[in-house]
From Swiss-Prot:
It catalyses: Transfers a segment of a (1->4)-alpha-D-glucan to a new position in an acceptor, which may be glucose or a (1->4)-alpha-D-glucan. Induction: Expressed constitutively. InterPro entries: A-amylase/a-glucTrfase_C, A-amylase/a-glucTrfase_central, Gal_mutarotase_sf_dom, GH-type_carb-bd, GH57_Enzymes, Glyco_hydro/deAcase_b/a-brl, Glyco_hydro_57/38_cen_sf, Glyco_hydro_57_N. This is 4-alpha-glucanotransferase. PANTHER family: ALPHA-AMYLASE-RELATED, ALPHA-AMYLASE-RELATED-RELATED.
Amino acid sequence: MERINFIFGIHNHQPLGNFGWVFEEAYNRSYRPFMEILEEFPEMKVNVHFSGPLLEWIEENKPDYLDLLRSLIKRGQLEIVVAGFYEPVLAAIPKEDRLVQIEMLKDYARKLGYDAKGVWLTERVWQPELVKSLREAGIEYVVVDDYHFMSAGLSKEELFWPYYTEDGGEVITVFPIDEKLRYLIPFRPVKKTIEYLESLTSDDPSKVAVFHDDGEKFGVWPGTYEWVYEKGWLREFFDAITSNEKINLMTYSEYLSKFTPRGLVYLPIASYFEMSEWSLPAKQAKLFVEFVEQLKEEGKFEKYRVFVRGGIWKNFFFKYPESNFMHKRMLMVSKAVRDNPEARKYILKAQCNDAYWHGVFGGIYLPHLRRTVWENIIKAQRYLKPENKILDVDFDGRAEIMVENDGFIATIKPHYGGSIFELSSKRKAVNYNDVLPRRWEHYHEVPEATKPEKESEEGIASIHELGKQIPEEIRRELAYDWQLRAILQDHFIKPEETLDNYRLVKYHELGDFVNQPYEYEMIENGVKLWREGGVYAEEKIPARVEKKIELTEDGFIAKYRVLLEKPYKALFGVEINLAVHSVMEKPEEFEAKEFEVNDPYGIGKVRIELDKAAKVWKFPIKTLSQSEAGWDFIQQGVSYTMLFPIEKELEFTVRFREL
């Protein structure tokens, strides 16, 4: 009889720093009911990966669930597949950290009664040199997408077998995940999956179809709880798979104990197909979507898709400078604390991938996820002796100035407005400037491709198929920044300008200081910066801005001196962007010599003091991003701009105090 081997796997993960209620809801809607139903079908076998943050939460909150996993492992129904413990993208962390991360999760698997030999590759981000790290960690097989193999030139028909791949003389087995199964399971009726699997049957006993995808598809994604559990999809699926003589259910290890991989392939740097769209800069991503849609309309996509390639995962460091800066700070501290087990514990947590990128989930746009990464970078850096240094932190070829004392770390970019791009408090373990600017994303112009499938299609929509229209109340408030957001950004503005024009980026910037280079010299506890620039009115008026930034025990002091070569009436504004995330602010204009900011579940309380009264413009920085639930209009921080009238010369002092 012709048969097909079938490997069924799920990947369960919640990011470090996610809200407790999210863990709880995902547990109740997916992780628990899935395993309870699995227990009812002793013939069903599942390959499962649980991430470290999720296992830690389960151990603390639902310890009985671990007993259920142990019993399923004992019965031979579960094969544990590991990854880095804190779910890092392995390609984006140092080799030394990869080995520790994998060993930590292997240790946890042993506690559950399983000696894991396989890796679920986080976000399936593959690069060839991972082979050496994986083999050194005792890993025998790794799971990626069929897209990786197609990118290497293999046809779809060749992707129903695992292959070997090699790097530097080390060899590992690679299983391809079938993309069609990812879109069928669990969104279409069970019979569709069975029909597809039966269409793959063969007299080759080694032919195998692999499904391995997010466990959250089974109850957490929109509409799936009702479909998978209440309408009985999962029970029907397990019953159909285990009772079908043409389908031979296996785990990865069982397959490898019976069959040898088909041959040797070399896979390029890749992830799954959707990632090649998301990781492109927005303009290119829009073109990519248009190109894919054009190929589909012409009926050519399936034939030529192997040659359709977009960006790679590491492109996110190019697309989002804030992600790149956070990542390079993590690498910097990782190298410095490698021999300190206590500090290293924190840096391994800071490698959790979710906050570094953005696709169909919130990712980098979720402030609480970024905050957790920064918290752990700062906690690790506490173990290092404070020192002032000039170095290229983010590897862009231009030096940053890092000023540090026992309480604070300030990273200043002289080449970008002489502004503070990191102000980290060691006491609170927060980065006060963890603020994303408002960026245009390619999906803000909703392409035809995102229209949901016709309602007559059986089943439910995957989150990749949900149609989305931007609500009008959000569209009215939508604005895109021309500059990155930092602390001590220097503006020249017309005296008659309004807060609304300023916050919606409809105002005219008169100066050339916000994103231009400043010269600098180091001083004790800080740095002196200056720029000879201009105010551009009817003609260019030469202007000089000097600022002396000194770290204090509770923050910093900035002493300003502003000079215009000839009289011109304007407003000089100093903008401070703060990572206020838990208090929803509204635009406001007020006069003040000092004011407090209170963000109880975020950065806490701080005070900004001036030596002379100023007009203050305050507004929330809100970004529009997509998520599995639709649109997120998220406050990334709050901008505070202190405005002083200037005609020829101006001197003032700004003090930032942590309370």
